[in-house]
Amino acid sequence: MALHIHRAERTDVLADGLGALLATPPADPFAQDLVVVPARGVERWLSQRLSHILGRGTGSDGICAGVSFRSPASLIAEIAGTGQDDPWSPEAMTWPLLEVIDASLDEPWCRTLADHLGHFADGEERELRAARRYAVTRRIAGLFASYARQRPGLPADWLAGDTAELTADLAWQPQLWRRLVEVMAIDPPHIRHAKTVALLRELGAGLPARLSLFGHTRLPATEVELLDAVAAHHELHLWLPHPSAQAWAALADLRGVVARRDDDSHRRITHPLLATLGRDLRELQRSLPASVETDEALTGSGSHPDTLLGWLQSDISANAVRPQGRSLRTEDRSVQIHSCHSPARQVDVLREVLLGLLVDDETLEPRDILVMCPDIERYAPLIAADFGLGDVVSDGHPAHRLRVRLADRSLVQTNPLLQVAAQLLSLAGSRVTATEVLNLAQSAPVRDRFGFTDDDLEDITRWVREANIRWGFDQEHRTPYGVDFVHNTWRFGLDRVLAGVALSDDSPGWIGNTLPLDDVGSNSVELTGRLTEYVERLRRAVDSLTGTRGLRDWLGSLAEAIRLITRVGDADAWQISQLEREFNEVLERAGSRRDTMLRLPDIHSLLRQHLAGRPTRANFRTGTLTVCTMVPMRSVPHRVVCLVGLDDTVFPRIGVADGDDALARESMTGERDVRSEDRQLLLDAIGAATETLVVTYTGANDYTGQPCPPAVPVAELLDAL
């Protein structure tokens, strides 16, 4: 068997090549072909593309069947025999690591970590530092997992006693790793990896005879070794999107991993965008195995259009800068870069640009348009307000008639119960300000529980303002903050509201220490009762989320607190199921250590880590205008590709270097760098646009109006144009 590499500038050409390969069925009619894809969006598009090639008759009405799509993580888990419960995953590793750290804080080698966690501090300082306990442990677990995946030789050297490469401030990590391996009592990742590679080379993986990896631009060192081993007994095809065959040829003799500071591969690249944006692809090329059966460049049938975008793509393809003999036509709008005054204005500009394109070209449909945002959670409400409100605003802006699908959002943003859970944990560790309580009351499950309408919430907000409610449930709740009076608390304000309802306008002014609130009519009796019940139930919920207890007790108390203040209808029962499923998954990952003692900041950090980056179901390629982050649809060709929010402070991601990351001290080629990853995403987007590329960014300060520079990659794109 062998390893085959197929390259093309566009993924549709790669998909057609893959379709031609899969059109020849395997010998076993019941066997499935295995295709590994980097993201759900690529999977959805690829399956639709293949359906026009596989199983069709005389037309394009085929079906993509007999093909199993997998993620790299699931394939590696199957090969390594870990399934979905890898004990060395960061989430699972955190719990035994927490146990090791707790037991080692008094030892001399752990002094650095002990000081950071306040083990030797006193009073308030000790409590504040101890609140970092879970968050720090989870971060260290992530570092250890990164070492094992990207540079497995490092933890292997630590177990062998070789720590020569480490500086003194990181000397605690090898000892902590050795203690963790002792507690785990199973093969550490590097030994498991070596055994798996040896077994694959000897016996094979029990996988289909033909495998394909489609659309990847970066592979860790361990995955490259596994794939090389798989190729010993299987036909392994790598389908790589690469913008320039000439650039690939220029780097063909570079092989092996080197220190990133010694990598001068960019000097062999002529086109500036290939040099500055394409580091991930260059490093992937040099990390691939040297023993390749075929290295094929697929050219496709189409040429680049005679537009500014076409010229840019043509120059990138040729790895050359060729401005001679070109004259930009006045009507050429194939590349649009808009400097706007705010995120809201960016979405307004996007709306007008897309409407103009749809009006000018009747063949253009919403499904031909892709909108990508580095920070989709910031832009999702703005996009929802500017698009797709046709059912609400019948005679509004024409853009409201467009069908828009927001994909790849986090669970917290799509499941209101999970959002309530996050808000309750924040309230439990805060002063319980009026704004926080009112924001929680706006949540749909809370509104359903207490019957709050929009008018009710307006009245409640007015009462809170007029009663001068600021923070704190009552005097007792304020005591830990050094404030011992009841004024401006929720108890004080509610007493004023209740007195205002109960007494007539001509009643005496003060009743003890309570001044009845004016303009609260007798018709508001029911609403004041519901408001009082809400605040009292919230107080009980918040009071239940205190102290130090086991993980199981914490999640049980949080679930009960959510039930106390929320209600969902039958149509939204999935929210409860999803909440229970996420909590059960946390418990399963903790395993036998689910009774580990945790504080409120620990449980808050745990759930935030667990839910962060866990996207919802794949709402891609549904026939609507798709809006998503920049990862899931990378390299997928669309007639119009829009990049919104490429601000200097957001893109590329400002990755603050972790001072405890041993890899960051001397980074090697092939290791993940988020800024290089974002730059590669921009290069992929340029190649994915077949007719129009639209980029927007904030070009003015929100407060002063002073000009702001574009993000550096956008400035480089402008220079190239």
Give the residues covered by each predicted segment.
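Polyanion-engaging groove/track-forming segments
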Residues: M1-L721
